[in-house]
Amino acid sequence: MASKSSFMATFNIVTLMLMVASSTVTARPLMKPSMGTSSPTTSLVYRLKLDEDTGYCWDSLMQLQHCSGELILFFLNGETYIGPGCCSAIRTIGRKCWPTMIGVLGFTAQEGDMLQGYCDGNDSDNNGEDHALASSTLPLSVNFKTTVVRSSASPSNP
């Protein structure tokens, strides 16, 4: 019985010490205290470039969501048509916003360069800018499959 009572006494003392210790410790604040305005480097608007001049970056990113089927077919089947809206979004993100964002969408840097190169090649307003594909340091390794499309409808005989 003596060992049981000494165990309980030790347990109570340790518990009491932990409670006292935890009451004297202060936790760090979850957010930095702000003095009127937040610093430019910690501001969410600054980090996401959400000022009035870069709203088109987010619009372009949303546009890429709508043309993801075209981009997948471009690489998967070798279908060589990407619409002008999709190309505009690719150029905007690659040149004016976040060049690495195309990689975040699941494409490699080489595939992003290929998309930009394709869109630059079809851009009539290129203004003499270098093509992203031509300036890429990565070797091309995408082999497109040739597909034959056959019409299943037979011509009608009068």
From Swiss-Prot:
Gene Ontology BP, a term: regulation of protein localization to cell surface
Domain of life: Eukaryota
Keywords, in A-Z order: Cytoplasmic vesicle, Fertilization, Glycoprotein, Secreted, Signal
Cellular localisation: Cytoplasmic vesicle; Secreted
GO cellular component entries: cytoplasmic vesicle; extracellular region; vesicle
Record carries keyword Glycoprotein: yes
Main location: cytoplasm
Glycosylation sites: 122
Cross-referenced Pfam families: Prolamin_like
Signal peptide start and end residues: 1-27
Tissue localization of expression: Restricted to female reproductive tissues, specifically accumulating in storage vesicles of the unfertilized egg cell.
Membrane-traversing stretches: none
Family statement: Belongs to the plant egg cell-secreted peptide family.
PANTHER family to which the protein is assigned, alphabetical: EGG CELL-SECRETED PROTEIN 1.5
Function: Involved in the regulation of gamete interactions during the double fertilization and to prevent multiple-pollen tube attraction; mediates the redistribution of the gamete fusogen HAP2/GCS1 to the cell surface after secretion upon sperm arrival.
Stated name of the protein: Egg cell-secreted protein 1.1
Gene: EC1.1
